[in-house]
Amino acid sequence: MAYARALLKLSGEALMGNQGYGIDPEIVQAIARDVAEVVATGTQLAIVVGGGNIFRGLKGSAAGMDRATADYVGMLATVMNAITLQDGLERAGIPTRVQTAIEMQEVAEPYIRRRAMRHLEKGRVVVFGAGCGNPFFTTDTTAALRAAEISADVVFKATKVDGVYDKDPHQFPDAVRYDSLTFQQVLSGELAVMDSTAIALCKDNNIPIVVFNLFEPGNIGKAVAGEPIGSRISN
């Protein structure tokens, strides 16, 4: 396998499938099947999940909520997704732990870096919830931060599109997909991959990002194996 330890970033929107809201159980099971194949190869996998299928802090803020309050609500939404994902993974036979940046001991472990790494070494999947525990930081930034903390070899951003484009492929039929590009190209071109804080964190810590389509069966395994899918961002 190309990567010994990887961090997978799942958006909340990915979990809702074609629904307008919430969690699609079939999507969760499809992700669990793909993750099971990856774990069986010996790759250590951590997951950061967003909460946009339930609540998005920026939208709450735009609607008049205090931004910090809205972000905390969004963090709680990610915990709901993390626990649901844990259930799906464990039903697929994958030992899984949820760690949250905001303590809620009845449902999850607190985030402790060394404990998370020990879980990974034992072949468990670790799902990180509640973002990084601070408002004003996205779950993409959390993914970059956790990847650096656990010494991940790569960040996988699994989305609804098959890579990074020079403009929105849903709006512009002539959009061009990049097979590979640099962090600096993403930052200077203001390409909508991750927010600039997340990109800068990966750039500074030399952690490549691979962006690919989550809904193509087997893509997580292909990405972990180092097959050329999606778009790769590196230094």
From Swiss-Prot:
Pathway(s): Pyrimidine metabolism; CTP biosynthesis via de novo pathway; UDP from UMP (UMPK route): step 1/1
Gene Ontology biological process terms, A to Z: 'de novo' CTP biosynthetic process; UDP biosynthetic process
Binding sites annotated in the UniProt record for ATP: K9, L10, S11, G12, G52, R56, T159, Y165, D168
Record's keyword terms, sorted: Allosteric enzyme, ATP-binding, Cytoplasm, Kinase, Nucleotide-binding, Pyrimidine biosynthesis, Transferase
Catalytic activity: UMP + ATP = UDP + ADP
CDD domains noted in UniProt: AAK_UMPK-PyrH-Ec
Cellular component, GO annotation: cytoplasm
InterPro entries noted in UniProt: AceGlu_kinase-like_sf, Asp/Glu/Uridylate_kinase, Uridylate_kinase, Uridylate_kinase_bac
Keyword Transferase part of the UniProt annotation: yes
Enzyme Commission number(s) of this protein: 2.7.4.22
Any one GO molecular function term: ATP binding
Matches recorded under Gene3D superfamilies: Acetylglutamate kinase-like
Subcellular location: Cytoplasm
Renumbered residue ranges of the record's region Involved in allosteric activation by GTP: 17-22
Chaperone found in the keyword field: no
Activity regulation statement: Allosterically activated by GTP. Inhibited by UTP.
Residues holding UMP: G51, D71, C132, G133, N134, P135, F136, F137, T138, T139
Chief place where the protein resides: cytoplasm
Known partners and oligomeric status: Homohexamer.
HAMAP family: PyrH_B
Family: Belongs to the UMP kinase family.
Primary role: Catalyzes the reversible phosphorylation of UMP to UDP.
Matches recorded under NCBIfam families: pyrH_bact
Entry protein name: Uridylate kinase
Species this chain originates from: Synechococcus sp. (strain CC9311)
